[in-house]
Swiss-Prot record:
GO MF annotation list: rRNA binding; structural constituent of ribosome
Protein name per UniProt: Large ribosomal subunit protein uL15
Organism of provenance: Acidovorax ebreus (strain TPSY)
Role: Binds to the 23S rRNA.
Similarity remark: Belongs to the universal ribosomal protein uL15 family.
Listed transmembrane segments: none
Matches recorded under HAMAP family: Ribosomal_uL15
Compositional bias of kind Gly residues: 21-31
Length: 143
């Protein structure tokens, strides 16, 4: 077998149906769209969510919550990412330089996701209770 000899099995591919090309084709004149009506016109279809004038579901349901504008200043980093960073001392600037947190991040929190075996000293970074225990068990510290 060679790459240039690979082809689909017989009958696997169907030719595209050419519509609107004369009565002999069986799909001439109205091209399978029937007579008149919105769906027979070009561009004739309702927008997504339109329910024929009835109040759409998206507007019937109540609004809930809001998106905090502070989220862009907060960042999370996993224990695995901290381990792979390979630095003995880590601060927010080091994480920004490594591309692990965004440029706007002001508060960084380590979450317990994965494992850590190297001793890492964190400064200016917070951690969850589980992550703190894992870092200290590996010989690291939080300042």
């Amino acid at each position: 077998m060679e790459l240039n000899s690979i082809k689909p099995a017989d009958g696997a591919k169907h030719a595209a149906r050419r519509v609107g090309r004369g009565i002999g084709s069986g799909l001439g004149k109205t091209a399978g769209r029937g007579h008149k009506g919105q769906k027979s016109r070009s561009g004739g279809y309702h927008k997504v969510g339109f329910e024929g004038g009835q109040m759409p579901l998206q507007r019937r349901l109540p609004k809930r919550g809001f998106k905090s504008h502070l989220l862009k200043f907060n960042a999370e980093i996993s224990l695995t990412a901290l381990e792979n960073l390979g630095l003995a001392e880590v601060d927010v600037l080091a994480l920004k330089n490594a591309g692990l947190v965004g440029e706007l991040a002001k508060v960084v929190k380590v979450i317990k996701s994965g494992e850590i075996s190297k001793a890492v000293k964190l400064s200016g970074i917070t951690a969850t209770a589980g992550a703190k225990a894992a870092i200290e068990a590996a010989g690291g510290s939080l300042a």
